[in-house]
């Protein structure tokens, strides 16, 4: 029987986001397997959920991207000496620096193992290089692994392990249908979608998401006689309001006022996806993973996206007919048109499962501890 492990995950805060979601998923898996799960962060809206699911939370200001964070080295080192975790799993750069500096001042007998996860393709710098300092460096996709090898040659390839993010099929079940109440509210809120083939572009309102390409696609499909409507699902930060106004101006210029809808941030993305005939991924830069693409495919919704980054990896494995060479807008329109005309849904997804992600991560923990 495996001995009980004490694992401490460290990240800036517990607000919404992919890093935070992954932290909670691993914490939940640790508790379910009978291990002690501790998370250190500056707090946030997900703390109560974390604690309710059986983990411990310790509040420490490990979030500030400034020299003031160095003042957290001593209290964090005291915390490590008191708890004596087997592993510290750093999930972001400032927490990783605080951890590395704390471990330097500890005796080898007291020092926990360090694991890092590279969640994104950070700006290449000595500051970011700290994420390659783990005994094991977890990359969330092959794309991230390539980024590490290309930009940080001092990182031994043998220390890098790819563990793809995953989706729980019970959370995004194949051919899921929303409740009658939800459908009634949806139809009342968005009557303009009735009788339309809905194209969805999920993601926050930023210049990287490919909105202008999306508008052009909607215009072209409409010109070909398809009854399409574009749905942009994602929140907008206050500082991005000028960009939103720019997008709205572009919509007017293309005479798509009645053909594009912004929903804002939605907490019911599963239900929203079921009302879409096609989900698009058109980011101008490679995504590190592409979770929304995987969620849509799990539901059986067809996806079309640029064949790059983590999205390209997912499409290659689960829905290759939806992959389009980056920037080829002619092929994009042809692929989207074919998907809408044939009305072919995606096939059940059998890879990129949450259970696999959790199992592989816990196996890394056990292997690192066992190699002592």
Residue ranges, per PLM feature:
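Short hydrophobic beta-strand element within catalytic cores of glycosyltransferases
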Residues: 39, 302-305
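Acidic donor-binding loop of glycosyltransferase active sites
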Residues: 274-288, 301
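Active-site donor-binding acidic/aromatic loop of nucleotide-activated sugar
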Residues: 239-244, 257-266, 272, 323
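Short, structured helix-loop element that forms part of the nucleotide-activated donor/catalytic region
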Residues: 45-51, 229-257
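A conserved, positively charged/aromatic
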Residues: 108-142, 153-154
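Conserved acidic donor-binding segment of nucleotide-sugar-dependent glycosyltransferases
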Residues: 317-330, 337-341
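A conserved mid-protein helix/loop that constitutes part of the nucleotide-sugar donor-binding site
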Residues: 17-28, 197, 201-220, 242
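Short His-centered aromatic/hydrophobic patch
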Residues: 90-96, 118
């Amino acid at each position: 029987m495996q001995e009980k492990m004490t694992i401490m995950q460290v990240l800036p805060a517990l607000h919404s986001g992919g890093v935070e979601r992954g932290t909670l998923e691993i914490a939940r898996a640790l508790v379910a397997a009978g291990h002690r799960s501790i998370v250190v962060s500056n707090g946030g809206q997900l703390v109560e959920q974390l604690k309710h699911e059986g983990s411990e939370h310790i509040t420490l200001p490990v979030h500030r991207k400034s020299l003031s964070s160095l003042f957290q080295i001593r209290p964090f080192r005291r915390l490590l000496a008191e708890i004596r975790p087997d592993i510290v799993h750093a999930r972001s750069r400032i927490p990783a620096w605080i951890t590395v500096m704390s471990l330097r001042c500890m005796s080898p007998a007291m020092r926990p193992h360090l694991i890092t996860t590279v969640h994104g393709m950070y700006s290449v710098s000595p500051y970011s290089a700290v994420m390659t300092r783990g005994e094991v460096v977890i990359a969330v996709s092959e794309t991230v692994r390539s980024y590490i090898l290309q930009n940080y040659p001092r990182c031994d390839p043998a220390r890098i392990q790819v563990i793809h993010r995953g989706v729980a099929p019970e959370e995004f079940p194949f051919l899921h249908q929303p409740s009658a109440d939800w459908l009634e509210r949806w139809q009342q809120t968005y009557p303009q979608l009735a009788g339309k083939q809905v194209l969805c572009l999920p993601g926050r309102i930023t210049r990287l998401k490919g909105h202008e390409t999306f508008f052009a696609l909607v215009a072209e499909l409409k010109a070909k006689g398809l009854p399409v409507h574009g749905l942009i699902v994602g929140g907008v930060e206050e500082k991005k309001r000028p960009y939103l106004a720019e997008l709205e101006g572009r919509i007017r210029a293309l005479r798509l006022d009645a053909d594009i809808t912004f929903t804002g941030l939605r907490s019911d993305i599963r239900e929203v996806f079921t009302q879409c005939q096609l989900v698009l991924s058109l980011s101008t830069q490679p995504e590190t993973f592409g979770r929304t693409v995987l969620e849509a495919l799990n539901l059986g919704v067809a996806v079309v996206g640029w064949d790059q980054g983590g999205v390209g990896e997912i499409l290659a494995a689960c829905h290759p007919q939806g992959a389009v060479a980056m920037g080829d807008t002619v092929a994009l329109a042809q692929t989207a048109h074919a998907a809408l005309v044939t009305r072919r849904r995606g096939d059940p997804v059998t890879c990129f499962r949450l259970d696999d992600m959790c199992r592989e991560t816990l196996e890394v923990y056990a292997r690192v501890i066992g190699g002592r």
